[in-house]
Amino acid sequence: MQYDAVRLGIGLYGISPMGGDATLRPISTLKTIILQIHDVPADETVGYSRKGLLQRPSRIAALPIGYADGLNRHLGNRRGYCIINGKQAPYVGNICMDVCMVDVTDIECREGDSVEIFGPNLSVETVAAWLDTIPYEVLTAVSTRIKRVYYSD
């Protein structure tokens, strides 16, 4: 027998396959930008099938990422959020193929600002838990349409 090989699996990406703190540092971030911001009155709807009913006058930001890019449709309708300028921005309405909408009513932001889908402020494990799945699925769902940028220390 030979014992000189290791299968790193998801550990290569800084995520423990067993959960918990394994002193691994996650290495991946999925980001986009705010494409547009619109003020939308209360009782209006947002997204496919008009599922996102707004309870109050809201500022809604459109993000150029959708389920064709790997953003899971089940995150829509406030079941998940992204991070904008350090604040949680809930997804409103259904996640569309190429775009999604988030509520930025209480967030100071503007078009062009960076949006973290997952990364240092929102872990892949957290997103996976919202979806009742495993981190592998969240990471491998990211489409080849998404530009990859690699950094070296």
Each predicted region: which residue ranges?
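Active-site anion/phosphate-binding pocket segments in diverse small-molecule metabolic enzymes
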Residues: 1-153
